[in-house]
From Swiss-Prot:
Protein name per UniProt: Putative S-adenosyl-L-methionine-dependent methyltransferase MAP_2076c
A Pfam family that the UniProt record links to this protein: LCM
Record EC number: 2.1.1.-
Methyltransferase recorded as keyword: yes
Organism whose genome encodes this protein: Mycolicibacterium paratuberculosis (strain ATCC BAA-968 / K-10)
Any one GO molecular-function label of the UniProt entry: methyltransferase activity
Keywords assigned: Methyltransferase, S-adenosyl-L-methionine, Transferase
SUPFAM superfamilies referenced in this protein's UniProt entry, alphabetically: S-adenosyl-L-methionine-dependent methyltransferases
Amino acid sequence: MPRTDNDTWDLSTSVGATATMVAAARAIATNADNPLIEDRFAEPLVRAVGVDFFTRWVTGDLVAADVDDHDSGWKLEHMPVAMAARTRFFDSFFQAATQAGIRQAVILASGLDARAYRLAWPAGTTVFEIDQPQVIEFKTATLAKLGATPQATLRTVAVDLRDDWPKALVEAGFDKGQPTAWIAEGLFGYLPPEAQDRLLDNITALSADGSRLACEAIPDMSEVDTEKAQEMMRRATAKWREHGFDLEFGDLGYQGERNDVAEYLDGLGWRSVGVPMSQLLADAGLEAIPQTNDSVSVADTIYYSSVLAK
């Protein structure tokens, strides 16, 4: 079902299911030989959500190669490698920000992100997690049952990013006078183009000089064969449905021309450095992800780290 302005979801449906998929990929990456990342909470969180498809994938009962359409550029088997590199990027961003003295962090659309629990935060750090109420409630309760303890002062902000989240964030104790480290991981593709701009405007308005932002940009779609891309998504959906999971991936994102993230941020006073996923993979010694013209490959995604100088 296509997205609507006021749609809702949990971690087993719609956009929420993609958070579970990403957590499953992190779990597999964590359990790999010589793992690049360590997210010990990913697997138990995926199991708690209870989507059989992802649970079987994490445990090895479902093999990605059996699910993937081998003629497509988008494959489930690429996910653990890609998410390992992506996770490392955002983990390193927070590490660099705290080493620079920042003690306030915000995770936008936090989903099953467990960084507040698994990273080594300096004393005095406050981490804010923002997501829909039922997502926040589920993750917080599940981690409590696991005996997990936040490694920083954790303040959850149960609000939809389409609502007045800046007000809710400030009411939760956010200090606009202090530099902040923000991350928007895996988020922009699920926002309409104008909502992406509005989010960046709000982040800027809330940020003190010296704040930092890490995000990923939707690649240029101009050279993508749209008809082939749509057919690829239909095939992928059909293959997943055969294995018991029905999610129309083509309905989850928003199309339309977007402002270039780096250029837009530069106009707001940020200075950005971008690195493509292909470079993150190479830097980590991970296998490259093949690129095709039937879709935008995850290898095309650009990851930005920005600093605000008002």
